[in-house]
Amino acid sequence: MTKQEQKFRERRVADRRSSSHKAIKELVQTRTEMLASYGKLASHQPFAQDGEVGVLLQKFCEALIDYTASAHFQLYRFIELEKERRGSVRQAAEQNYGKIVMTTKSILDFNDRYEDESALEEPDRLKTDLSGLGEIIARRIELEDKLIKELTASR
């Protein structure tokens, strides 16, 4: 391999790494916003049918969907499109992607149930559902962090 070819190859690798780091940064940002929104909503227990809880719930649902979409489109799609060539990253993605998809279904179900403020008519159910969702989000974050660890590891 000539020096010019080597430099070109190194530049392509650097570009791919830059793309993956950007995707990670965006994922972590949307995750942080979602977790902050979750905390604000959860701190308003016991839940009551008032405007404040409804607004917090809607903001949380929006942040939750933004986070879920960011994870899919920024991180997993990056790997799916085979822009990532490291075997350890691809292996981590294969081991965890199916589990992450299952959490996505639960997230979407929660959003569908609570996108309408009439769901506040059952505050005890919201408390239970929010607690269960918190566990699902924690599991999802663990799985994503495994992927992030591989993406940020040096060769």
What do these predicted regions represent?
Residues 1-155:
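Surface-exposed peri-terminal alpha-helical interaction modules
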